[in-house]
Design a protein with these regions (language model features):
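Beta-strand-rich domains and repeat architectures in extracellular enzymes and scaffolds
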Residues: 26-38, 42-44
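Conserved beta-propeller blade signature
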Residues: 41-43, 87-90, 126-129, 170-172, ...
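Gly/Pro-rich loop segments of beta-rich domains
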Residues: 26-30, 60-79, 105-118, 144-160, ...
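Residue-level detector of Asp-centered blade-edge/turn motifs that repeat once per structural unit
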Residues: 36-38, 83-86, 122-125, 164-168, ...
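Structural recognition of the beta-propeller blade-terminating site
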Residues: 46, 56, 92, 101-102, ...
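Short loop/turn segments immediately following the C-termini of beta-strands
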Residues: 47, 93, 132, 176, ...
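Acidic, polar low-complexity linker/tail segments
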Residues: 1-25
Length: 247
């Protein structure tokens, strides 16, 4: 032990191995979702730490906030969050809530539910919340519930992640159970089924093995995170396969 200098913390597990890490402010632990604000800052949600870390566009650490709990700026293993008009909306999955907070983590509004919200997206009028079921809750931006859209189980089973196009009139949902991406048109608080991808569990191009999130580009193409195929697939606005990255 005489070779070990003072003022150094060494972390050992119960077997005596040095397997644990000290996580600094610039590291992220189990990042699950990411979003940007109007200034280009990047917000990263750490799943197990129940925390959001903020970095500037060059990757420099700025701040962090959150924590496990029931407080309005705490959550319990949230699955998805978004930033819309520089307000953060969080699907607090095991807290059974949707929460809105400022870009510095200050409280705004809370909506409570008996379900376990997983997916969240917003347009200029409403916030859409997906659950591990075939229903979508529609809230206003102050998180007052406006409607619940019950979708036929033929089209939707488990909304894990979702996004809305730039026009605010299309909603793309990653359906975890059905291994598909399904798209709906938006009219006010109403959703109408439009189209969906193949729903077989497969590693072939155009198919998914547990999709967990979606995103639109400015041309209306849809990108979906294909979890167990370890890739992102791109479909055009008609949901025809275009390309992929990852394997």
């Amino acid at each position: 032990t005489s070779d070990i200098p003072a003022n150094i913390l060494i972390m050992l597990d119960t077997s005596g191995s040095m397997n644990d890490k000290l996580y600094s402010s610039v590291q992220v632990y189990y990042p699950l979702d990411v979003a940007t604000d109007s200034a280009g800052n990047v917000y990263v949600m750490e799943y197990y730490n129940n925390r959001i870390k903020v970095f500037d566009s060059s990757g420099a650490y700025l701040r962090s906030f959150g924590g496990y709990g029931n407080g309005c700026n705490q959550w319990q293993y949230a699955r998805q969050f978004i930033i819309y008009n520089d307000v953060i909306y969080i699907a607090d999955t095991y807290g059974r809530k949707v929460k809105s907070i400022t870009l510095t983590g200050q409280c705004k509004d809370i909506w409570s539910t008996s379900q376990y919200p997983h997916a969240i997206a917003a347009n200029s009028n409403y916030v859409f919340v997906g659950h591990p079921s075939n229903s979508i809750s529609v809230l206003d931006h102050r998180l007052n519930q406006r409607s619940t859209e019950s979708i036929s189980s033929n089209y939707l089973s488990y909304a894990w992640g979702m996004s809305i196009n730039s026009a605010g009139n299309r909603l793309a949902i990653a359906d975890y159970n059905k291994n598909q991406v399904v798209e709906f048109s938006i009219s006010g608080t109403s959703l109408s089924y439009t189209q969906r991808t193949n729903s077989s569990y497969s590693s072939s191009n155009g198919y998914y093995r547990r999709p967990t999130d979606t995103g639109y580009d400015s041309s209306g193409n849809i990108y979906a995170l294909d979890l167990y195929n370890h890739r992102i697939q791109k479909k055009n606005s008609s949901l025809a396969y275009q390309t992929k990255t990852g394997s």
